Amino acid sequence: MKIILLGPPGAGKGTQAKFISEEYSIPHISTGDIFRKNISDKTPLGIEAKEYLDKGQLVPDEVTINIVKDRLSEDDCESGFLLDGFPRTVYQAEALDSFLNANDNKIDMVLLIDVPRELIFDRMTGRRICPSCGASYHVKFNPPKLKDKCDICNNDIIQRKDDTESTVKDRLDVYEKQTEPLINYYKKQGVISTIEGSGEINQVFQRAKSALGAVCK
């Protein structure tokens, strides 16, 4: 089964991707993970990607397509995969379709996680992280016991650059402008299914399983 997850930043795609990957025994392929590794290793790709990500912008198509193709060519993708973070533009989607078609494959379902913009904004701007131990918090949904202090190591928790109000607004604007046309692209192919992304994590997962059941019979 070959699946794509779509949805705005902060919609919980990464969390649902892990659940789906485990449920259906397919690899979870996150372009975010690929970029983070390159950024950590300070590769040319990582340096270039970081410049865009720090501004809340999407990484250009040409930087991402070949690395995704290489990943999809690995043995563990023969029985299927779940793409999280790719494609983000119609151009990327067309490149993916061409690659899959050349190998007699196709996308089985595009799962769109739909969350209101206002909720996304609250989710993202409220996130905090401990720079020392990596523990994560949320000022509204998962606050630390002591304000601005990590429960684990007692160091100050911080807001990442990606989670500031201005950056979140920019990221959502970029998503709406560049990514949402994918919805129409996949609607024309008849492979898109939309689920409500609000509520408890397990509730969203049950909705995802119900939608995916149509291609798992």
UniProtKB/Swiss-Prot annotation:
PROSITE patterns per the UniProt record, alphabetical: ADENYLATE_KINASE
Binding positions (AMP): 31, 36, 57-59, 85-88, 92, 160, 171
Major location category of this protein: cytoplasm
Keyword line: ATP-binding, Cytoplasm, Kinase, Metal-binding, Nucleotide biosynthesis, Nucleotide-binding, Transferase, Zinc
Catalytic function, reaction form: AMP + ATP = 2 ADP
Binding site for ATP: 10-15, 127, 136-137, 199
Annotated binding of Zn(2+), by residue: 130, 133, 150, 153
Location(s) in or outside the cell: Cytoplasm
Pathway noted in the entry: Purine metabolism; AMP biosynthesis via salvage pathway; AMP from ADP: step 1/1
Family: Belongs to the adenylate kinase family.
Assembly: Monomer.
Role summary: Catalyzes the reversible transfer of the terminal phosphate group between ATP and AMP. Plays an important role in cellular energy homeostasis and in adenine nucleotide metabolism.
Protein name: Adenylate kinase
